[in-house]
Amino acid sequence: MSEVDLYNLAPMFQLMAVGLAVAALPLAWWLWKQRSATPSQRLRALTLITLFVTFDLVLFGAFTRLTDSGLGCPDWPGCYGSATPIGAKVEITAAQTAMPTGPVTHSKAWIEMVHRYLATGVGVLILSLALMTWWLRRQQIRAGQTPDPLLHPVWPWFTLAWVCLQGAFGALTVTMKLFPAIVTLHLMFGVGLLAVLMAQAVRYEGAAARAVPAGLRRGLWLAFVLLWVQIGLGGWVSTNYAVLACPDFPTCHGQWLPAMNWQGFDVWRELGMTPDGQLLPFEALVSI
């Protein structure tokens, strides 16, 4: 597939319709269940629904990664210019015939596209959350009321900007052919989106902030940083296919300090390559 073909916006409106369909059921359920709730309760419920669907999306993204389906449809946002693998049956069959165990097969194409459908649905839910916050706040202002601080639009619109950036990384993951740094950032932004939505849901509870001892606060921040480092390292292992570089545990090839090559931590390089275009040595995978 040529560089020109990597982005094909022809199926964009069809994919947007699919995203609306994915979001329609949870939105309908939310409207019915929260029809008599207060504004903050309605927003909290919608945030929790969005959080649940986003968590499912992250899990399915991991499944997409584990099944090596990230390039099941090698263009973006559709699949060979179609909204579903059905419309790309001829192209997928040709690719699968040429490489039966390659990156493009019918099953991998469906896995990748379902991941994109879920991502589009999450985008619709987050857009709905931002628009609902704006509308409820506007209604209070029109009624001459002091706007509820919980209805401040900064959080929802920040979340919307975040998910748009996450979508951009999702596109680059495909068009840059699983470039390790991009795939790792895509993972971390996905986990970060979960954290942002959780913080937003807690905020809508309206609970008063509690004082935290300085020592505990420092410990929590340290744990937070270590958690993100570990998530990043785990993503780097996965994106570089380095998980089996050490087949034993807790040693590596029977050694506590095996031979290592730190080129594995050169960030800006293609998959399996060094920054100067050479094949990445096995010792680099061991170091990762």
Model-inferred region functions:
Residues Q140, P147-R210:
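Long, hydrophobic, well-ordered secondary-structure blocks that form the structural core
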Residues M1-P11:
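Short, strongly hydrophobic alpha-helical membrane anchors
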Residues P26-A37, A130-Q140, A199-A208:
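Structural signal for the C-terminal ends of transmembrane alpha-helices
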Residues A10-V18, W110-S128, P180-A195, A284-I288:
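Membrane-interface loop-to-helix entry segments
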Residues S2, L66-M113, V243-V286:
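Extracytosolic (periplasmic/ER-lumenal) interhelical loops and adjacent juxtamembrane/interface segments
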Residues L46-D68, L226-V237:
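N-terminal signal-anchor transmembrane alpha helix
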Residues R42-T47, P147-L160, L216-L220:
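Membrane-interfacial loop-to-transmembrane alpha-helix junctions, especially the N-terminal start
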Residues F13-W32:
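Hydrophobic core of alpha-helical transmembrane segments in multi-pass integral membrane proteins
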